[in-house]
Amino acid sequence: PAGPFRIPKCRKEFQQAQHLRACQQWLHKQAMQSGSGPSWTLDDEFDFEDDMENPQGPQQRPPLLQQCCNELHQEEPLCVCPTLKGASKAVKQQVRQQLGQQGQQGPHLQHVISRIYQTATHLPKVCNIRQVSVCPFKKTMPGPS
């Protein structure tokens, strides 16, 4: 089957990592709070180098993000993007249900979904995973799926 898990080993890692539970919560939280506070997603949001030298500085990661980074560091580099893609997909389904119940479909839903993928794309870089910087998800609006 196609989809994010063309590499069987990664599917197994995804299940062992409990589907990156902390990352899913983080993606969900980021996508839903549109436009409030630092988003931790965009390239110029903060300087990663300073972050490395000064771990206790003002850029300290929220605990949930730290948990998510720990989950990603346990993955093999090869599997980081496929497992993140799996997590993004799971969050997309949650959000679709949630907004569907509130009757908020359409443009708002598309906006939230694109935020999920945008956040996921940059997670390896935010988490300082050496071998992976940005996952090549399509940033464009996802079509019907």
Curated annotation (Swiss-Prot):
SUPFAM superfamilies: Bifunctional inhibitor/lipid-transfer protein/seed storage 2S albumin
SMART domains for this protein: AAI (SM00499)
Biased composition (Acidic residues): 42-53
Propeptide stretches in the record: 40-54
Keywords: Allergen, Disulfide bond, Seed storage protein, Storage protein
GO function term, MF aspect, one: nutrient reservoir activity
Region of interest: Disordered: 34-62
InterPro entries: Bifun_inhib/LTP/seed_sf (IPR036312), Bifunc_inhib/LTP/seed_store (IPR016140), Napin/2SS/CON (IPR000617)
Reported impact of residue 6 to G: In 1.0101, 1.0104/SIN1, 1.0106/SIN3 and 1.0108/SIN5
Matching Pfam families: Tryp_alpha_amyl
Phenotype for residue 41 to A: In 1.0103/SA2S2
Signal peptide span: none
Function: This is a 2S seed storage protein.
Subunit structure as annotated in this protein's UniProt entry: The protein consists of two chains linked by disulfide bonds.
Family per similarity comment: Belongs to the 2S seed storage albumins family.
Protein name: Allergen Sin a 1
Phylogenetic placement of the source organism: Eukaryota, Viridiplantae, Streptophyta, Embryophyta, Tracheophyta
